[in-house]
A protein has these predicted regions:
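Extreme N-terminal starter segment of soluble prokaryotic enzymes
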Residues: 1-3
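Active-site neighborhood for divalent-cation/phosphate handling
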Residues: 115-191
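Short beta-strand-loop/turn "lid" adjacent to the catalytic site in phosphate-handling enzymes
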Residues: 76-122, 150-158
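Conserved active-site "lid/cap" helical segment
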Residues: 37-85, 129
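A short acidic Gly-Thr/Ser loop motif
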Residues: 6-11
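Short glycine-rich, Thr/Ser-proximal phosphate-binding strand/loop in the N-terminal lobe
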Residues: 12-56
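Conserved small/polar residues in nucleotide/adenosyl-binding loops
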Residues: 192-198
């Protein structure tokens, strides 16, 4: 099974294609300066790494170039995008709505959009990436992975700020916790390296 992992910024698109059977990275790369002059893509596969200029008016064109790099030339790592079984999208803010990763639907996209005031630089970029991927990859299943989900079990005494409660009620102002995907990975690995019990 091959999984494409995506991390979109407002003007960037990081990607990594992983063969889950052997947990091997088949390729990885970065599209930069999307929507600006002098866009570029750096693609690495088969021991070959190259940065080339490109024209990326939107994330859709960037995704199309990623597909081209993965399926042609020296950086080719698959014959066709139909080999990709699923796509994972990093989404920075899931607010109180998303406590775990979930399959992306129109309703999920709308909810991520509603949460954009909590992450105005990141969530809109995540939506751009999801919508662009849908155009390029069609019906490939896509999953949203939320940075905030790891921290969703914090009790109120840990997440409430010493500010008027109405800010929480009206605007959702509270501690959420970030970089949860990194914490989720590092926690069990740390226990293993320190030879501690995981329970």
């Amino acid at each position: 099974m091959k999984i494409l992992v995506i991390n979109c910024g407002s003007s960037s698109l990081k990607y990594q294609l992983i063969d889950m059977d052997g947990e091997k990275v088949l390729c990885k790369g970065l599209c930069e300066r999307i929507g600006m002059e002098s866009s570029m893509i750096t693609h690495e596969a088969n021991g070959h790494k190259a940065t080339t200029p490109a024209i990326f008016p939107t994330h859709t064109e960037a995704f199309a170039e990623v597909v081209k790099k993965m399926t042609t030339g020296e950086g080719k790592c698959i014959d066709d995008v139909s080999e990709i079984s699923a796509i994972g999208h990093r989404v920075v803010h899931g607010g109180e709505k998303f406590k775990a990763s979930c399959l992306i639907t129109d309703e999920v996209i709308n909810t991520i959009r509603e949460l954009s005031p909590l992450a105005p630089l990141h969530n809109p970029a995540g939506i751009l990436g999801i919508e662009a991927a849908r155009k390029v990859f069609g019906n490939v299943p896509m999953v949203a992975v939320f940075d905030t989900a790891f921290h969703s079990t914090m009790p109120p005494k840990a997440y409430m700020y010493a500010i008027p409660y109405e800010y929480y009620e009206k605007y959702g102002v509270r501690r959420y916790g970030f970089h949860g995907t990194s914490h989720k990975y590092v926690s069990p690995v740390s226990y293993t390296h320190l030879t501690l019990p995981t329970n």
